[in-house]
Amino acid sequence: MSAKEIFFDVKAREKLSRGVDKLANAVKVTLGPKGRNVAIEKSFGAPVITKDGVTVAKEIELSDKFENMGAQLVKEVASKTSDAAGDGTTTATILAQAIYREGVKLVAAGRNPMAIKRGIDKAVEGLITELANLAKPTRDQKEIAQIGTISANSDTTIGNIIAEAMAKVGKEGVITVEEAKGLETTMDVVEGMRFDRGYLSPYFVTNPEKMVCEMDNPYILCTEKKISSMKDMLPVLEQVAKVNRPLMIIAEDVEGEALATLVVNKLRGALQVVAVKAPGFGDRRKAMLQDIAVLTGGQVASDDTGSKLENMTLAELGTAKRIVIDKENTTVVDGAGKSEDIKARVKQIRAQIEDSTSDYDREKLQERLAKLVGGVAVVHVGAATEVEMKEKKDRVEDALNATRAAVEEGIVPGGGTALIRVAKVLCDIKPADDDELAGVNIIRRAIEEPLRQIALNAGFEGSIVVEKVREGKDGFGFNAATGEYEDLIKAGVIDPKKVTRTALQNAASVASLLLTTECAIAEKPEPKKDAAMPDMGGMGGMGGMGGMY
């Protein structure tokens, strides 16, 4: 086990504080509409240019291990805020720095850090309650566009595209972000259910120009089994051929004799048919097949239900108004499932989302939910260069997360104003002693810091701006984009309440942990060994040079 280096008390907090400041100072230059970019060197390829706080924070690793501890803890604030609310990472970092900076001074002066922490916790609790009172629900598409615009660094195009996507697919719908082939940023909405499996053979194509298979009013057969023999499928195929309607087969796989027979019948015109693989894997595949069956009003041929493929009737097959299948995707439009069955399935998936502890599982369940109720919108981000593409994609994702947060918990005045407005509640808090009061006062000063930094980045004196905003009421605040003092809600400068709340909670939590840290331990750096002198053995013949001066 390698030797450890240990610092206590003032020395430990001083080292941690230096790391906190280095990370926070790099992140906070990005805050606000006039925030600056940060260039990040990459070991390969072009440097990344970004104005996204969490991207900057994640890149920072300090050489001093004690300073790095402080930086990593504040990085945790940014990451946790990004995970929970999708935005507000820079605000959270600034708040954490301000709370810790103020707290360290008081602890150094002899205050009790545990009592200070209790004061901080009481203050944050009061502010969060008041934020809920200040928040207003999002009323229309215009407000959603404004939130998206602010989160995308005042890019109205991105804001409008996100608002349009949310209007089309609804609150439950899935919006994904992909790279476009051209310069334009566009949005497509997929109607109905789409899953990422295409036709098993190009011979199933009905539109050779577009290389897609299109069918109107088809039957849909779902089975979780692999189909390799024709005899299992024959009874169903005969029934479908009699009524002269198209058939889509969704199975684990269709291969060998079964696939060859389907292709031959399709080419001869005896049967309009297409086969695709079932989406997902394992238990998730079973669940997704059941979703398709519910949506189309059919049943899944499965051992679990005792339903065998060879015994299936037309009544057990699903139907849809239309299906479109290309090489990679299948889209089922307007399935014929009963609305009460779909509602019951949606309710079941929502319950699973509530119970899920895995982020990955929750994300997959939400995708399934969206396919059943809302649909899927795809935002294609276009840019001239790869560097610009990455930066723009980050901004689109930020805007998307912010708008979702706004729909969830409502909106508050933006530009750091909401925290100034709720500060009045701190006067009602009754601390148990002077040290707790000191904790409340730390929060009172720290919540001014985001507005101060926004003003500073825009070229204004922070203290003057804070004082002017404090004198106003309700939505009155400082619009850094124009340099004007106005009603920010009317001007469209709004923040999701969830983002402000999460930033404050996470910042206070980590800053309190740092304040109550009395000892820091890290591995001792190994001393550098002096380079060995080269062997001089081969120079023995120089003895005859003694006459030289």
From Swiss-Prot:
Cystines in this chain: none
Annotated EC: 5.6.1.7
EC class name: isomerase
GO molecular function: ATP binding; ATP-dependent protein folding chaperone; isomerase activity; unfolded protein binding
Keywords: ATP-binding, Chaperone, Cytoplasm, Isomerase, Nucleotide-binding
Membrane-crossing residue ranges in chain numbering: none
Primary role: Together with its co-chaperonin GroES, plays an essential role in assisting protein folding. The GroEL-GroES system forms a nano-cage that allows encapsulation of the non-native substrate proteins and provides a physical environment optimized to promote and accelerate protein folding.
The name this protein goes by in its record: Chaperonin GroEL
Gene source species: Desulfovibrio desulfuricans (strain ATCC 27774 / DSM 6949 / MB)
Annotated gene: groEL
